[in-house]
């Protein structure tokens, strides 16, 4: 995966992630080799949109999940909602391999996967108004103050998400870092095209988001999980 410079400034964008490759299991390696051609999507050339109708072979409500980890949550949702299409973006190959294994095991035809910088894909390759929902669950909190600029949830990113959502489309975030949760609220409440479904500055119930092993482990340690659920206004300003 290449790192493309910003067309206007020529500068490399600030990354919200670090590629911690980790070791691939034999099953993950096999899945990447055999299943990627069917379920993996390459990033299009600069300025060209993803043709998701062609990629999925149909037109259906589309959910984008950014940073899906090992894909446990995404696979569960795709199995529960076969009427929806799920595009997952993740930079870590072991997680992509694990999701592809789940896709095969569960016979999920409504999942496609990309290994790319999700912020760049969102900005340059997703048509405006084309998404039914965007999900970001447990992103890197970058807890040190000097690293806060690396947090994915920033005003520019939220503005881009709002543009890609269809009217009535949702943005669902979750984190177990209280400081990041408050930061998310600050940024989201300032976006005029999004409305908090639970009221101003309110956190949301977990709703349809599956509880993952990672989350259950944190809850046993006493971590609190914060969900935020917003919808794009039907008549955005």
From Swiss-Prot:
Active-site residues per Swiss-Prot or TrEMBL entry: 140
InterPro entries, sorted: SAM-dependent_MTases_sf (IPR029063), tRNA_(Gua-N-7)_MeTrfase_Trmb (IPR003358), tRNA_methyltr_TrmB_bact (IPR055361)
Coiled coil: none
Positions that bind substrate: 144, 176, 212-215
EC number assigned by the record: 2.1.1.33
Keywords annotated in UniProt: Methyltransferase, S-adenosyl-L-methionine, Transferase, tRNA processing
Catalytic activity: guanosine(46) in tRNA + S-adenosyl-L-methionine = N(7)-methylguanosine(46) in tRNA + S-adenosyl-L-homocysteine
Gene3D superfamilies on file: Vaccinia Virus protein VP39
EC supergroup of this enzyme: transferase
Pfam families the UniProt entry points to: Methyltransf_4
SUPFAM superfamilies noted in UniProt: S-adenosyl-L-methionine-dependent methyltransferases
Function per UniProt: Catalyzes the formation of N(7)-methylguanine at position 46 (m7G46) in tRNA.
Protein name as catalogued: tRNA (guanine-N(7)-)-methyltransferase
């Amino acid at each position: 995966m290449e790192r493309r410079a910003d067309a206007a400034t020529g500068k490399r964008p600030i990354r919200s992630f670090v590629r911690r490759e980790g070791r691939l299991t034999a099953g993950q390696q096999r899945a990447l080799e055999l299943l990627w051609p069917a379920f993996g999507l390459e990033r299009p050339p600069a300025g060209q949109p993803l043709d998701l109708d062609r990629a999925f072979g149909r037109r259906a409500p589309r959910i984008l999940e950014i940073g899906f980890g090992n894909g446990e949550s995404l696979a569960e949702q795709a199995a529960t909602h076969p009427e929806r299409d799920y595009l997952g973006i993740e930079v870590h190959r072991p997680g992509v391999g694990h999701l592809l294994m789940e896709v095969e095991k569960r016979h999920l035809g409504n999942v496609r996967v990309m290994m790319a910088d999700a912020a760049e894909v969102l900005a340059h390759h997703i048509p405006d108004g084309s998404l039914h929902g965007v999900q970001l669950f447990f992103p890197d909190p970058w807890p040190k103050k000097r690293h806060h600029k690396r947090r994915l949830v920033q005003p520019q990113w939220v503005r881009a998400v709002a543009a890609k959502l269809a009217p009535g489309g949702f943005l669902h975030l979750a984190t177990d870092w209280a400081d990041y949760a408050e930061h998310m609220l600050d940024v989201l409440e300032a976006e005029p095209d999004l409305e908090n479904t639970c009221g101003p500055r309110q956190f949301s119930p977990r709703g349809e988001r599956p509880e993952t092993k990672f989350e259950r482990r944190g809850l046993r340690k006493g971590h609190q999980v914060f969900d935020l659920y917003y919808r794009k206004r039907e008549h955005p300003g």
